[in-house]
Amino acid sequence: MAETKIVVGPQPFSVGEEYPWLAERDEDGAVVTFTGKVRNHNLGDSVNALTLEHYPGMTEKALAEIVDEARNRWPLGRVTVIHRIGELWPGDEIVFVGVTSAHRSSAFEAGQFIMDYLKTRAPFWKREATPEGDRWVEARESDQQAAKRW
């Protein structure tokens, strides 16, 4: 039975606490995880903090649709998507994606697909605090290109 966990909120998460739920199914031979962190730099500038905003309800729906699309493309077991919001600092974890499948290729591809689509289709907005002031982070062309390959 396929199971999905989607969480959007300000609370920190623990990769060590998320992994056991992903790994407990004996029918899954592969567990792939990705964790994204706040960098201390972007576009050549120092980043002191990152504020993430979202559209409540719509964001969770968009993430569920992305996971459903991944499930339609690959035979997946469990999927976890966690995305933090609020003010974060360099080194803080922002996003966690965990995917299980019977085989590694499906798990790797689905995890990458989910991240590529999350970056381009989920309604999140980022504002960076730099020494020169705050600025909104615009979508990257490289993220759009990554999503197009699917």
From Swiss-Prot:
Domain of life (superkingdom): Bacteria
Pathway(s) the chain acts in: Cofactor biosynthesis; molybdopterin biosynthesis
Alphabetical list of Gene3D superfamilies matching this protein: Molybdopterin biosynthesis MoaE subunit
Annotated phenotype, changing M115A: 4-fold lower activity than wild-type
UniProt EC number: 2.8.1.12
Catalytic activities: 2 [molybdopterin-synthase sulfur-carrier protein]-C-terminal-Gly-aminoethanethioate + cyclic pyranopterin phosphate + H2O = molybdopterin + 2 [molybdopterin-synthase sulfur-carrier protein]-C-terminal Gly-Gly + 2 H(+)
Enzyme category, top tier: transferase
CDD domains in UniProt: MoaE
Effect of R39A: 24-fold lower activity than wild-type
Protein residues bound to substrate: K37, V38, R39, H103, R104, K119, K126, R127, E128
Upregulating conditions: By anaerobiosis, repressed by the molybdenum cofactor.
Keywords of the record: Isopeptide bond, Molybdenum cofactor biosynthesis, Transferase
Family: Belongs to the MoaE family.
Note: The cross-link is not seen in all structures of the MoaE-MoaD complex.
Protein name in the entry: Molybdopterin synthase catalytic subunit
Gene it is expressed from: moaE
